[in-house]
């Protein structure tokens, strides 16, 4: 399948020109800006950041990254700004429709984990509300910020961002007029102080736990509070606070039940059933509102910026005040810091892909997507809520948890599955610290929840409530067996033995647990739930088997490095046995692929008969790489079966325009029949699901790359699919954000669905299918710093001539790589910075190519030809900081 070309030119500019407005891009320190943080001076109504101050920051306009803009259907698109302690979601006109489905209609607005603060904040100029009475002309997404432009006699550029380390969101309005004006500026805010758990359908539910908010006015700010003890057994007393205010002193205020700007009176979403096409609030909401009014003098032709902050805390009003003051004291300084941090992220893993500029741009934005996914919460009260059926007393407290939020708006919390896949993208992007913190959080929660059994919790809300993943839950086997592999992944990319040692005991207990509790028939194939659960599946799942094989090899490697011969031998013996029996047990000739599961529980005589249902997990034997001592790293699948299975998955019964279906089409006993192509004769017991998740597509992209299949009809189909849903204006919802699900035959595009019935606007796991294929497979970066070595063996994709990457982080150093393929010559140029490791460089030969000569730094050199899953690799020992390899082909 050939990738479809992008329909419209990607809207991009080479710097955040207009981060605040055309003249106010980044706030640099200058004589015109406040020198210190702190609350604004109290006194003069009408004090603003004036045009002189705005002009002083123009020099910062080139220090940020690129921008993506949208001008069409802005009211149908979700907006998102994120920091590690707060985030906000509305639409791209600056309004705040009721959003999300975990607590229907309540997942948007302003949040600071684990607490929602506001349904929204609305701005009116001289009685005209921005986003409704004054239409939004353009929405722009940048690296760590967003901007909405409005026209009118007084033009407005609204810039939102969330400073990291602060429980607040900042909004800057930059006003500009051709004539002198005094503008009446109204700001409405509607509170909804509500924890991220319980949800709408759980017991107790969100409405039962939520208490009425109260509103007050003091010292120029609106203050909203919710305090008391909910009438729920085991609920604790709380004192939630949200504050709204400005760098400008208000001339008036009002309090009342509404104050939703143009969204009054509110359309209320029901708890369930069919919602209206548009809602403003939910039946669970118990918030209140307020208004602040300002008088702003706008000088002719000179921009005037007014800042607003939404801050809060689940601790106390005093804590909320501290967060508010940190935010509003010097917004420009915080904006500068945000831009500087995002520029540093952009500078790591900087790639040059002249043969695939769309993928290059996807690498850029995927790094930002990862940074946008970082969340942190404090004092998590760990309790097993048993899939929403109970609410026991907490078993303990995790003081601090930091993680990659799975997806916004409905999943911005701690998941094992998501974090484990996302870690591969994170190391490729150089974002080691959050990946480490994610694993620590999983360990800390899991050990409290499961009494140190070794089982990994699946889904943990920022309150500490664990929806699934306790010892009594039926499985999440795959997440538990993947954990040692992610520890090993980070150890190999960082060489951090302390981190290895910190997580080693838990990793050992992971695999001891699954053999003790999830192999009741002692056949070595683990029981329990995994990534896919559908009717008719056997109790032993393919993906759990694959990731167990990888986990055993990785645990053995960790054990060997610690001289733990007992665990090394135990894990190696288990892995050897599993790998010897795998192909015979799981391969199905008639399906041209692997069984999804074995051992039908409804048929005791099943005796491990394979069950084939065409799920995406059938690709995992080709996706997961196994590290075996003395052998090249390779997937579990045999090369012969991998070629057959990958060829099959590229066909229309499995692959659509944007990537891999969740469940392929073909003969089925399901009453709904087969809606698509048939590529085999096996009769499945379930219907197809032609929904294209960005994770499924990532799995396929990685699997293709593991076997050197980088061509236009192979890996590039899937890397292009994920890049397009993130960057193609004909496809995206939120510019630059990797979504959870692509527009698919069985999953229509989000933009046409109600805000309460959408998949995630930003989902971290899709970055796996962009960053890992480029860095690990195309650029060939394969560190093993735990053992003091690194291999850099690139493969230029078919139809291309060059791939390059710089500042690819390895441990405390980095590597630059350039690979070229032209005529009969392959060139690999490598520069190592700050690494004390043995370095091997090389290249993957084109299929059928033969070597005539090899030189290193201009001199003939010895080399090895190594047969790997990717193909034949030329490998050469490199010395020094820079190496230049030339391979001449016959």
Please provide the spans of the model-predicted regions.
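Secretory targeting and sorting signals
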Residues: 1-44
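An extended acidic
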Residues: 48-150, 223-269, 341-355, 362, ...
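Polysaccharide-binding surfaces and accessory modules of carbohydrate-active proteins
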Residues: 55-63, 147, 152-265, 290-292, ...
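An acidic-aromatic substrate-binding cleft motif
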Residues: 59, 63-65, 71, 328-406
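Non-catalytic C-terminal accessory modules of carbohydrate-active enzymes
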Residues: 117, 124-159, 699, 706-890
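Short Pro-Gly-centered flexible turn/kink motifs
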Residues: 134-137, 173, 181-185, 295-319, ...
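Active-site acid/base region of carbohydrate-active enzymes
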Residues: 235-260, 354-391, 429, 438-457, ...
């Amino acid at each position: 399948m050939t990738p479809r070309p992008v329909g419209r030119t990607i809207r991009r500019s080479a710097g955040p020109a207009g981060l605040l407005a055309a003249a106010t891009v980044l706030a640099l320190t200058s004589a015109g800006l406040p020198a210190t943080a702190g609350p604004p001076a109290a006194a003069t109504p009408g004090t603003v950041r004036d045009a002189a101050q705005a002009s002083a920051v123009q020099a910062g306009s080139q220090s940020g990254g690129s921008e993506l803009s949208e001008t069409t259907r802005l009211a149908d698109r979700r907006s998102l700004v994120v920091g590690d302690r707060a985030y906000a979601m509305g639409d791209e006109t600056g309004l705040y429709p009721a959003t999300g489905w975990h607590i229907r209609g309540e997942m948007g607005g302003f949040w600071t984990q684990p607490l929602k603060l506001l349904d929204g904040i609305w701005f009116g100029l001289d009685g005209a509300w921005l986003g409704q009475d004054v239409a939004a002309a353009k929405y722009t997404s940048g690296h760590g910020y967003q901007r909405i432009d409005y026209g009118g006699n007084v033009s407005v550029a609204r810039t939102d961002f969330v400073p990291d380390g602060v429980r607040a969101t900042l909004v800057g309005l930059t006003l500009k007029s051709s004539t002198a004006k005094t503008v009446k500026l109204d700001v409405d805010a509607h509170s909804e102080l509500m924890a991220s758990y319980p949800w709408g359908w759980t017991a107790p539910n969100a409405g039962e736990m939520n208490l009425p908010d109260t509103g007050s006015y003091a010292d120029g700010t609106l203050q909203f509070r919710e305090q008391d003890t909910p009438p729920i057994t085991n609920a604790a007393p709380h004192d939630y606070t949200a504050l709204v205010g400005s760098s400008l002193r208000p001339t008036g205020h009002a309090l009342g039940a509404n104050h939703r700007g143009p969204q009054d009176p509110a359309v209320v979403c029901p708890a369930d059933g069919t919602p209206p096409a548009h809602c403003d609030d939910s039946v669970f909401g118990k918030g209140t509102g307020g208004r602040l009014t300002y008088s702003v003098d706008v000088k002719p032709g000179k921009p005037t910026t007014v800042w607003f902050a939404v801050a809060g805390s689940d601790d106390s009003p005093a804590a909320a005040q501290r967060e508010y003051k940190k935010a509003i004291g010097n917004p420009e300084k915080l904006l500068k810091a945000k831009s500087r941090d995002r520029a540093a992220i952009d500078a790591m893993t900087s790639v040059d892909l002249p043969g695939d500029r769309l993928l290059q741009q996807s690498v850029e934005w995927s790094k930002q997507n990862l940074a946008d996914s970082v969340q942190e919460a404090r004092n998590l009260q760990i309790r097993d809520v048993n899939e929403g059926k109970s609410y026991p007393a907490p078993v303990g407290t995790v003081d601090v948890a930091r993680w990659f939020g799975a997806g916004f708006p409905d999943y911005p919390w701690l998941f094992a599955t998501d974090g484990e896949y996302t870690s591969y993208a994170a190391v490729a992007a150089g974002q080691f610290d959050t990946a480490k913190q994610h694993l620590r959080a999983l360990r800390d929660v899991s050990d409290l929840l499961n009494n140190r059994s070794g089982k990994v919790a699946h889904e943990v809300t920022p309150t500490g409530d664990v929806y699934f993943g306790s010892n009594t839950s039926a499985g999440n086997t795959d997440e538990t067996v993947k954990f040692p592999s992610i520890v090993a992944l980070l150890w190999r990319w960082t060489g951090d033995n302390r981190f290895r040692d910190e997580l080693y005991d838990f990793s050992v207990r992971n695999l001891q647990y699954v053999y003790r509790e999830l192999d009741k028939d002692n056949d070595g194939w683990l029981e329990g739930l995994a990534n896919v659960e559908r009717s008719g599946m056997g109790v032993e799942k393919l993906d759990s088997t694959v990731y167990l094989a990888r986990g055993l090899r990785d645990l053995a490697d960790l054990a060997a490095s610690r001289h733990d011969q007992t665990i090394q031998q135990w894990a190696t013996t288990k892995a050897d046995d599993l790998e010897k029996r795998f192909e015979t047990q799981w391969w199905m000739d008639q399906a041209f692929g692997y069984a999804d599961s074995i051992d039908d529980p409804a048929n005791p005589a099943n005796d491990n008969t394979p069950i084939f249902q065409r799920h995406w997990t059938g690709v995992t034997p080709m996706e997961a790489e196994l590290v075996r001592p003395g052998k090249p790293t390779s997937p579990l699948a045999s090369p012969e079966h991998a070629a057959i299975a990958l060829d099959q998955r590229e066909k229309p019964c499995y692959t659509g325009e944007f990537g891999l279906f969740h469940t392929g089409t073909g003969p089925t006993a399901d009453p709904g029949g087969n809606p698509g192509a048939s590529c085999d004769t096996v009769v499945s017991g379930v219907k197809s699901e032609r929904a294209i998740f960005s994770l499924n597509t990532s799995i396929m992209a990685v699997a293709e790359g593991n076997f050197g299949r980088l061509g236009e009809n192979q890996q590039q189909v899937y890397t292009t699919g994920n890049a397009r849903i993130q960057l193609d204006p004909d496809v995206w919802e939120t510019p630059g954000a990797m979504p959870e699900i692509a527009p698919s035959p069985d999953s229509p595009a989000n933009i046409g669905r109600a805000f309460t019935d959408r998949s995630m606007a930003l989902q971290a796991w899709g970055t796996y299918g962009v960053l890992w294929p480029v860095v690990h497979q195309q650029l060939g970066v394969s560190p093993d710093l735990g053992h003091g070595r690194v291999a850099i063996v690139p493969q230029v994709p078919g139809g291309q001539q060059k791939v390059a990457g710089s500042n690819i982080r390895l441990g405390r150093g980095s590597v630059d790589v350039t690979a070229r393929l032209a005529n009969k010559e392959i060139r690999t140029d490598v520069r190592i910075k700050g690494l004390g490791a043995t370095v091997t460089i090389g290249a993957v030969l084109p299929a059928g190519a033969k070597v005539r000569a090899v030189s290193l730094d201009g001199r003939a050199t010895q080399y090895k030809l190594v047969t790997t899953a990717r193909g034949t690799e030329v490998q050469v020992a490199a010395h020094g900081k820079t190496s230049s390899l030339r391979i001449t082909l016959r």
